[in-house]
Amino acid sequence: MRRALGATLWLAVSACRPTGGTPSGFTLLFFDHSPAAALAGRSWVPLPDSSRLVAFDPQLRIVRTLTDPRLNTPVGVVPYRGRDLLVTEFTGAGVVVDTAGRVLREWPGPFTASLYTAGGGHVLASRSPYFVQPLAPESPTAPLVQLLDSAGRPTDGLGQLHVPSSPFLLGPTNAGALAADSGGAFYFGPLARDEISKYDRTGRRLWTTKRGLRAHETDPVFLPARGVRLPLALAVVNVALAIGPDGRLYALGSEDSAATRLRVDVLDAATGRILETRRLGAGRTAVAVDARGALAVFDADSLLATAHSPGREPFTPAFALPDLGGVVGDTVPLGHFAGRVTLVNFWASWCDPCREEFPLMAALYGEFDRKDFEIAAISDDVDAGKMRAFVAQFRPPFPILVGGGRMKATYHYRGLPYSVLLDRRGGIIARIFGFGGAAEFQRLHDTIAKEVRAP
């Protein structure tokens, strides 16, 4: 998986341990670079690198884990309508799930990539700070944020854009952190400018606060082209915003352009006055408040390490699909692969990354014995002729199963290629979204080799 906050944000944050012994009565505000969601006595956090949501109790013990193919790379989560969770995907999709993990709805978002928040009965979207895409020109009269209905459709635009020198930089310049309170006001912190502003529910700016994070500010600019790529220079300032259980605004920001020196500021939501500042060290952190409203900082990896492993979830639903090279009318069931580590790969002839992936899959297939490892490559082509032409071109050594264009609706993946690595008992070892090149396949090889050796 590939992702970035702004140009550079997926780097280490701070790690310091709170004083005062065992944690008690905490609400998480931020976990690593993402805002957390407080709902029904639990703090929910997104874990983009493991494609899941995790819930902590007030003692910061993990009490629930949610996974779904539609939770591909979750980077943000907020409470939604008092009982559900609204998840921001790295690509900008919005996914509404209940606390049992059922996906209730999803939408693509109003911007090239969106970040969502909810409060005061409203859903709002800003341009995402996690996936900044230049070269998508926008009108300077476009709104800063979009008000959405319950289906994720824009109903109104609020706030004014900061207009940079090039229309191609409107998106990166106006991407940023977003939060909303129960009264319907919203707070916006531009990714690359040292300011945080509060707006009322009509989009009127109420106050703006600067935190002194930058001595000199510049808008994002293009660097000299590198081949077909046009790099973007962007200094990360605002990372994430959250409304605490005490009604105060908490701002996670960066004191250096690469977001390696982070700090948390506590602001009076009514006036924007900074009440407290806490600087964070090196490493991944979890920032929380206790029942008295005091800030506490924990090592995020240590909190995750205390989780009891529930075991691997099964791959469902089980399939029984025709083998392109088999006898007409026969099907190959998932159970056929039992007893072997298996890579279930979904692909299609129209998928360009799939074309890059197939030679690497063929090489991977040849590196293991058939009693230990197998690949089930499932085509999701509707056009059987194009599927057969693809197979004739690449001549894969592994089985090709025919999905007939029904696989996305069955397994709910967002794009292709999509792969699921299964252990010998059919439990999910890993989900792989997209194509990560040779480096990803080397990691996959190492994971398979380790699993093959496991008792």
For each of these PLM feature ranges, what is it?
Residues 306-334:
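N-terminal "domain-start" segment that seeds a small globular fold
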Residues 343-344, 375, 419:
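Hydrophobic beta-strand anchors of alpha/beta hydrolase catalytic cores
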Residues 372-385, 396-405:
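Thiol-based oxidoreductase modules, predominantly thioredoxin-like and allied folds used
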Residues 390-397, 402-449:
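Thiol/disulfide oxidoreductase modules built on the thioredoxin-like
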Residues 1-16:
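Sec-dependent N-terminal signal peptides of Gram-negative exported proteins
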Residues 340-342, 346-350, 415:
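Short pre-active-site segment immediately N-terminal to redox-active cysteine/selenocysteine motifs
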Residues 346-363:
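Conserved redox-active cysteine motifs that mediate thiol-disulfide chemistry
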Residues 16-317, 412:
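Eukaryotic scaffold repeat domains enriched in small/polar residues
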